């Protein structure tokens, strides 16, 4: 029979928790650190793991060493996922920044992903407003506002009317 979780060493409990978290989806290192340091719900309510900073560092190092944690892979998958959901580069940059990913890593991954953002913006506009896209000023402003909210750059938005004019 396994020993109760309260008697297991903090490192083993942290490692078990990290693997369970990373089994669900990829996380950035900062996200994993935040989740590991948060209290976990036990049978008697929230439980803290009495772990040292060294325990956290060892767990993070183990996850990197065994390829459970890889910020580069996380960034590529995140960009692919968010672009499939119709979000533009500005929004993706901002979300990755919130997840602790450096701007340089994000820019490198964005260059490698080969996504045509103006085509994506056009697809999102057509999905929301239909074909043909509005041509009067007030309706164009609505489309622009929608696409800016979704994270597309103004250059990509303006390309819609230049490249896809009927």
Curated annotation (Swiss-Prot):
Where is the major localization of this protein? Answer: cytoplasm
> Which InterPro entries does this one have?
RecX_HTH_1st, RecX_HTH_2nd, RecX_HTH_3rd, Regulatory_RecX, WH-like_DNA-bd_sf
Alphabetized Gene3D superfamilies for the sequence: Winged helix-like DNA-binding domain superfamily/Winged helix DNA-binding domain
Name the domain of life this protein comes from: Bacteria
Q: Name one GO cellular component term.
A: cytoplasm
Q: Which Pfam families does the entry mention?
A: RecX_HTH1, RecX_HTH2, RecX_HTH3
This chain's function reads: Modulates RecA activity.
Name of this chain's protein: Regulatory protein RecX
* Lineage, broadest ranks: Bacteria, Pseudomonadati, Pseudomonadota, Gammaproteobacteria, Enterobacterales
């Amino acid at each position: 029979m396994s020993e109760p979780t309260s008697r297991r060493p903090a490192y083993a409990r942290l490692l078990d928790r990290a693997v369970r978290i990373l089994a669900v989806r990829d996380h950035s290192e900062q996200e994993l650190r935040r989740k590991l340091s948060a209290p976990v719900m036990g049978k008697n309510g929230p439980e803290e793991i009495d772990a040292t900073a060294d325990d956290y560092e060892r767990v993070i190092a183990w996850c990197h060493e065994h390829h459970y944690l890889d910020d580069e892979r996380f960034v590529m998958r995140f960009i692919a996922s968010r672009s499939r959901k119709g979000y533009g580069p500005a929004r993706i940059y901002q979300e990755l920044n919130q997840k602790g990913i450096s701007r340089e890593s994000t820019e490198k991954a964005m260059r490698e992903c080969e996504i045509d953002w103006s085509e994506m913006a056009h697809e999102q506009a057509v999905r929301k407003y239909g074909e043909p896209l509005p041509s009067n000023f007030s309706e164009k402003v609505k489309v622009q506002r929608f696409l800016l909210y979704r994270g597309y750059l103004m250059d990509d938005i303006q390309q819609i009317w230049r490249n896809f004019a009927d």
